[in-house]
Design a protein with these regions (language model features):
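Acidic, metal-coordinating catalytic segment for phosphate/diphosphate chemistry
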Residues: 1-36
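A short N-terminal helical cap/helix-turn-helix that marks the beginning
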Residues: 161-167
Length: 189
């Protein structure tokens, strides 16, 4: 919900947080942070087939919810490792999209902020599906991406952005980890 009027800038009345009547704990209706990595190798993109609802059976980018105090870059690397067995180091942000987690509508408690990174697949390491996480993993060329996609509110836009990024250099904005670098990063050329 917006906090200010888009026309005049005046503050808008904000709804109070949802509060538990039993223990008085407040629950804010903020978006849940999620992170994923567009893992590529030789021009192909690694996708996973979801093993669980929502969107069970649909193709998705490896990713998931960020843990408490987990940097999105770390979450993206962890999710790729858990779902595919690959060790990657996300190197640049592709973009961010807001969406609903569940297919039954944009309920305020299901809103997600999805942060996607580029990552190169290491060497010739084979990706393998962890059956506790995903049903299948597969590599797809940019012009052969599957039609059955999870999260249709944002994933098609993510894949369009990935395809477009493959045609230009630099691909995206480099991401800074939690640590402040000892020196300024080299400018992107």
């Amino acid at each position: 919900m917006p906090r200010f009027c888009s026309e005049c800038g005046a503050p808008l009345p904000a709804p109070p947080p949802v509060t538990c009547r039993a223990c008085d704990t407040s629950h804010w209706l903020d978006a849940k942070p999620c992170a994923g990595a567009l893992v590529s190798r030789a021009g192909k993109l690694l996708l996973v087939r979801r093993a669980h609802e929502p969107w069970k059976g649909a193709w998705d980018v490896p990713g998931g919810f960020c843990g408490p105090r987990e940097h999105p870059r770390e979450a993206a690397a962890r999710e790729v490792r858990e779902e595919t067995g690959l060790e990657v180091e996300p190197d640049a942000i592709l973009g961010m999209w807001v969406d609903s987690y569940a297919p039954d509508g944009p309920g305020a408690d299901k809103v997600t902020l999805n942060i996607y990174f580029h990552a190169a697949a290491p060497g010739t390491a084979a990706a393998r599906a962890d059956p506790n996480e995903v049903a299948e993993v597969a590599w797809f060329a940019a012009d052969e991406l599957p039609e059955s996609l999870a999260f249709p509110g944002h994933l098609p836009a993510v894949l369009r952005a990935w395809r477009a990024s493959q045609e230009r250099t630099p691909r995206a904005t480099p991401v800074q980890s939690r640590a402040v670098p000892a020196r300024a990063p080299d400018p992107m050329v």
